[in-house]
Design a protein with these regions (language model features):
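Conserved "right-hand" nucleotidyltransferase catalytic core of DNA-directed polymerases
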Residues: 1-13, 33-35, 99, 110, ...
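Amphipathic, charged-and-aliphatic alpha-helical interface segments
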Residues: 202, 213, 408-426
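Metal-dependent catalytic core segments for phosphate chemistry
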Residues: 19-22, 361, 368-403
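Short active-site loop/helix that positions an aromatic residue
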Residues: 69-81, 98, 228-235, 365-379, ...
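Ser/Thr-glycine-rich phosphate-binding loops at phosphate-binding pockets of nucleotides
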Residues: 7-13, 22-24, 67
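Cytochrome P450 catalytic domain signature, combining two hallmark sequence patches
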Residues: 82-85, 206, 238-241, 323-325, ...
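Alpha-helical scaffolds flanking conserved acidic
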Residues: 87-90, 172-177, 409-419
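Active-site-proximal helix-loop-helix substrate-binding element of RNase H-like nuclease domains
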Residues: 25-49, 55-166, 389-400
Length: 484
């Protein structure tokens, strides 16, 4: 039995702010309706005034939905139906694996599917799924009837897309299921430690703003336009006050003590990494942050991290290991004073195992680089991996800095890693600067041009493979049914 389904729900919790876990487990969350089709039949509707359909409890049933994690969580946590992850097929995951949009509306448009999403949905969700100012919900019968039809149409759209695109292979389906299990297990955090961090961040921001107001005559760290005017009055001309700009300005030797201090305060007060403490505290439920891992979230097929908190993009700490260990105990555990730099360096440390458990951080080492080299026949690089060498250090040593392998520093390796991973997919100099910036690495255009040239020389077979793959993809599309 295959059941295509879609839920419309209402809640006092904002799913975009709090995340799916908090949304599905909140006492205010209710089902408005469920549209469903059994084995491709007519799309029908269920509403909570009737008993929960027994077919949902069938352990042999399969469920298909767009973004199936939502339907799974509503079934498990709101309707208390004991479904399993391996019962689900996610048509959104299928679309992602076929390099199609992960928006139901956009995907249907791109495929010119038989059914299209009803644009009325956004208005209905605003009116029916979110509480009014008095905390109650709008239950207007006419609007609900429109919502019911909208929900049924979503199922028709999902079914029409699923019929048109290639299903996940059995192996990829098992990866998707494992992803859902990982998401349900979640990442452990200590709410009390997060509260300590948030409290100290707020204290620091207050102190920073108090000092910067005194220095500038009334401007805070979060008023860049006003600070630019103030700097201009001190004969310091800048176009913006981004983190990169401020860092470069602080390297100048001709700044007055007053200007230098204002820039330092702006740098501390605008640290975005510390905002993750607030988001962690907001989305965690009973010390767990769930549903942050996205199957096939990147166009290359790699995982992404979303759900209101990107756990794959936590800023690298500026402090050393010993400093972090001391600061962790003092700041997070005891809630005693800490600087913004220390707090920024402790974001990763906020994720930790409960007492009696060990938190193991594991990663596939240079997996994309290894596979790209192997597929392209870049055997000299494959041999480096066989010898257990670090290719990022090797590339930094031979191509970027001309220093012995053993003398490659942590910062050199990080720049080299950005260059290798960015250039692997054909990035030019401008694209590499942007790619590296996304990894938290600052590269000049000159450094980027040098890295691109060096990569394409060192990885000549990988470069050739780009055009081979492009030609094969075009030929496959033009000649359906033939492998290339």
């Amino acid at each position: 039995m295959l059941i295509n389904l879609d839920f419309e729900t209402r809640s006092k919790v904002d799913i975009k702010d709090k995340g799916l876990d908090a949304y599905a487990k909140d006492i205010s969350t209710e089902v408005i309706c469920m549209a469903y089709s059994i084995d491709g039949g007519e799309v029908k509707l269920w509403t909570p005034q009737f008993a929960i359909p027994q077919f949902l409890f069938n352990p042999e049933a399969r469920f298909s939905a767009w973004n199936a994690a939502f339907e799974y969580n509503i079934l498990r946590n709101v309707l208390e139906v004991p479904v399993r992850h391996d019962q689900f097929i996610d048509s959104m995951a299928m679309a992602a694996a076929n390099n199609l949009p992960q928006s139901l509306d956009d995907c249907a448009q791109v495929l010119d599917a038989e059914f299209k999403k009803d644009p009325i949905g956004k208005r209905l969700i605003q009116k029916l799924s979110k509480p009014k100012k008095d905390g109650t919900f709008n239950k207007d019968p006419d609007l609900l009837d429109q919502m019911y039809e909208y929900c049924k149409q979503d199922v028709r759209v999902e079914m029409s897309i699923a019929r048109q695109i290639r299903a996940l292979s059995s192996n990829e389906q098992s990866v998707w299921v494992l992803t859902q299990k990982i998401n349900e297990s979640g990442v452990p955090v200590d709410p009390d430690e997060l509260k300590n961090a948030v409290f100290l961040c707020e204290n620091n921001k207050t102190a920073i703003n108090r000092e910067i107001v005194e220095l500038t005559g009334g401007y805070t760290a979060n008023q860049p336009a006003k600070l630019i005017e103030w700097l201009s009055s001190r004969n310091v001309i800048v176009d913006d006050l981004t983190a990169e700009t401020v860092t470069k300005m602080l390297q100048r030797s001709n700044l007055t003590d007053e200007v230098k201090r204002v820039l330092e305060l702006r740098q501390q007060g605008s640290m975005t990494s510390v905002a993750k403490y607030e988001k962690m505290l907001e989305v965690q439920v009973a010390g767990r942050i769930r549903n942050t891992l996205v199957y096939h979230g990147a166009s290359t097929g790699r995982f992404a991290s979303r759900g209101g908190l990107n756990l794959q993009n936590i800023a690298r700490p500026s402090l050393g290991d010993a400093e972090i260990e001391e600061a962790n105990e003092r700041i997070l555990v005891r809630g005693e004073g800490g600087t913004m730099e220390e707090l920024s360096s402790l974001v990763r440390s906020a994720i930790k195992a409960p007492d009696g458990f060990t938190f193991i951080d594991a990663d596939l080492s240079s997996i994309e680089n290894r596979v790209a080299s192997w597929i392209a026949g870049q055997n000299d690089k494959v041999e480096l991996f066989r010898q257990g060498l670090d290719e990022y250090k090797a590339f930094a040593s031979s191509a970027l800095y001309n220093v012995p392998y053993e003398e490659v520093t942590k910062d050199m390796r990080q720049i080299s890693k950005s260059a290798v991973l960015g250039c692997m997919f054909g990035q030019g100099a401008k694209g590499l600067v942007e790619y590296a910036d996304g990894m938290g690495v600052k590269m000049t255009m000159g450094e980027s041009e040098k890295a691109v040239k060096a990569y394409r020389h060192a990885y000549a077979k990988v470069k050739s493979a780009w055009y081979d793959f492009e030609g094969a993809a075009i030929a496959a599309i033009q000649n359906e049914g033939h492998p290339y």
